[in-house]
Amino acid sequence: MAIRRCWPRVVPGPALGWLLLLLNVLAPGRASPRLLDFPAPVCAQEGLSCRVKNSTCLDDSWIHPKNLTPSSPKNIYINLSVSSTQHGELVPVLHVEWTLQTDASILYLEGAELSVLQLNTNERLCVKFQFLSMLQHHRKRWRFSFSHFVVDPGQEYEVTVHHLPKPIPDGDPNHKSKIIFVPDCEDSKMKMTTSCVSSGSLWDPNITVETLDTQHLRVDFTLWNESTPYQVLLESFSDSENHSCFDVVKQIFAPRQEEFHQRANVTFTLSKFHWCCHHHVQVQPFFSSCLNDCLRHAVTVPCPVISNTTVPKPVADYIPLWVYGLITLIAILLVGSVIVLIICMTWRLSGADQEKHGDDSKINGILPVADLTPPPLRPRKVWIVYSADHPLYVEVVLKFAQFLITACGTEVALDLLEEQVISEVGVMTWVSRQKQEMVESNSKIIILCSRGTQAKWKAILGWAEPAVQLRCDHWKPAGDLFTAAMNMILPDFKRPACFGTYVVCYFSGICSERDVPDLFNITSRYPLMDRFEEVYFRIQDLEMFEPGRMHHVRELTGDNYLQSPSGRQLKEAVLRFQEWQTQCPDWFERENLCLADGQDLPSLDEEVFEDPLLPPGGGIVKQQPLVRELPSDGCLVVDVCVSEEESRMAKLDPQLWPQRELVAHTLQSMVLPAEQVPAAHVVEPLHLPDGSGAAAQLPMTEDSEACPLLGVQRNSILCLPVDSDDLPLCSTPMMSPDHLQGDAREQLESLMLSVLQQSLSGQPLESWPRPEVVLEGCTPSEEEQRQSVQSDQGYISRSSPQPPEWLTEEEELELGEPVESLSPEELRSLRKLQRQLFFWELEKNPGWNSLEPRRPTPEEQNPS
């Protein structure tokens, strides 16, 4: 609420006074409450000394509240009266009168505060009655009045009487208010005030309007005794409507003093329409006291009334004869057109009715087949994005892709079908290629939702849930392709124009709509195979429903997809996975490696898995021993250990890497029982009856793959784990010396020492010796990782420099002449350092993260 702090009679300072004077000059017509300057207000009574002074509407009791305060006034009476100022001007003033209550609170009454608030401008004016003496009880009720608030016509005010001191904020109010409305200058009492007289309240323009002819109108009025411009407004209406059909404004310049109270006239040119005859004339003065808000005087001129004595001539007297002929011709044409239209509509409706009742197909609302042209089907391509939750679910995805290819003629991009390409180009490159190809060819991306998709989506969002690492993703060479695909897909879901590229589906029976991530709630979700027909129309970019027709693919409607062999296989795969879910309700938690606590799932029952994809440890194990060269009189003996309990097949293929022209040699295979062959032994040449020797004898006693590196007429060491159930230390043909026998450990240490000596002496690599160490017991997956690691890293068994293949044993001995020997203490220190570097290299290899390499002991880390 705005607070007015000063008025013309109260000037706190010269700067504020000049500011108020400037505001009064800039806005002379602004209405605001003020105090009457004459006579001075008096509040003293018999038995009371009182003084009236201007107030800022902020009493000290608000800042320093008191405990005891007086009660509110008893009654308030407000009257409007007219008073004269010191200059003789008549102004409207408010007469405020109130009485006190007859209680003990008058003993604490220190005064009263009167305030007037102008409601339209929110300006407030306050005065304060300050009691200089204490009130005493007497026989009459104390009564006070104040008649010095000057108000303006047509304004609304709120008058408040507040006893002092004011109460505390939570105390009972001790004030009363009343609202009063001041009439405008049309009131008989207010018309005589100076403000109303200056705004023309006593001016009677005596407006007269005269119609000169049908096109001109003259307005006369009397001027007022002020040199001010006038404006005459004319607005015309029709006799039956309130909408203006014509308006015009005329200006009259300010008259001279001798022209005051004289008549002025202005002429208007009317509208050309004779029906625009109802006129409304207004005269607006621009007096200095009111400017644009001065009272307008108006007069209305109705349309002229046609006299009954004036009989108009018949219209027929003015119409020529040819008009009658034209009207008759138009009437005949209209009637003929209506007749022809009725005949045509009748004929058309009868023909349509015959067609409708003559064809049974049309009775059912189906158009003839000959009249419909089915939309053309084009070969399309889709990319299937899924999460490998379980081997059975992967089988369902494969069967679904097979159904799309065989039954629907749709090309499918699936990671399981392009593992070789993914291994060549990488996961992200393959995913980005598929995404770009789908966008450029306007193809579709099918997203198959399952429990794994929901879990991986929550992992992408960073929810406080366990991490997701599914067992099938761990088996796949490419790993988790769903997360990589989602990272490529996410930006498209910020653009609504890209929503049509994606088709979100889930297999009903093994998945539910709860498995669909929240990201896809803005798109349609299709349960398979219930709504596969709609999915197929999405793939073809065709509308299934059109005005008056509905398209169907008979082979895909309902359960008709079971008529095709691929559809039946898909159904069987879904039922097989559904049965597995029923037997193992916690199958997903057990498939998640992060929740399985390192325990493997039990092997799946053969009754459930009739045709497993790649069960753990299953399949055909292919082992390729590397044969460098055989002499003409030598042969290679491959010994395969067959265990009666094993039901798998193992294939051992020798792969020859000749360095020069090969000579004829003999290859002999022998099958020995596993219990007759030791776990690890030094292989001795086997002399055959024809005199040739065997290169090596390798017993297959483990489920893993072994790749012995056989040298020319040399014995190889086969190192196995100490416990047959333990995994090897690493996936490369090297092991910690702790698991080697005494001879093998000495041979390995001699190899390290030889390498170190050759590096110190700067001899060529061709002079290095050729002892080799071969490990057995690596799984097929670890062997694949080993081959890739060997090709990329280069530091394992193949990183050991090998002498040229064409050197004989005597030439190698000549090249391997010993260098200057070192002291035993230096050799021991170098040997420990080489062993420490060897084990550190094993730990740094990225392909050994899942294994537990042996760390060097503190004594080995700090050689003496």
From Swiss-Prot:
PROSITE patterns: SEFIR. It comes from the Eukaryota. It is a single-pass type I membrane protein. Residues 778-824 are annotated as: Disordered. The keyword Cell membrane applies. One of its GO terms (biological process) is protein catabolic process. Induction: Up-regulated in brain upon West Nile virus infection. Residues 32-322 are extracellular. The keyword Transmembrane helix applies. Keywords: Adaptive immunity, Cell membrane, Disulfide bond, Glycoprotein, Host-virus interaction, Immunity, Inflammatory response, Innate immunity, Membrane, Phosphoprotein, Receptor, Signal, Transmembrane, Transmembrane helix. Widely expressed. Highly expressed in T cells and macrophages. Highly expressed in B-1a B cells and at a lower extent in B-1b and B-2 B cells (at protein level). The modification Phosphoserine is found at S736. Forms heterodimers with IL17RC; the heterodimer binds IL17A and IL17F homodimers as well as the heterodimer formed by IL17A and IL17F. Forms complexes with 2:1 binding stoichiometry: two receptor chains for one interleukin molecule. IL17A homodimer preferentially drives the formation of IL17RA-IL17RC heterodimeric receptor complex, whereas IL17F homodimer forms predominantly complexes with IL17RC homodimer. Receptor for IL17A and IL17F, major effector cytokines of innate and adaptive immune system involved in antimicrobial host defense and maintenance of tissue integrity. Receptor for IL17A. Receptor for IL17F. Binds to IL17A with higher affinity than to IL17F. Binds IL17A and IL17F homodimers as part of a heterodimeric complex with IL17RC. Also binds heterodimers formed by IL17A and IL17F as part of a heterodimeric complex with IL17RC. This is Interleukin-17 receptor A. It comes from Mus musculus.
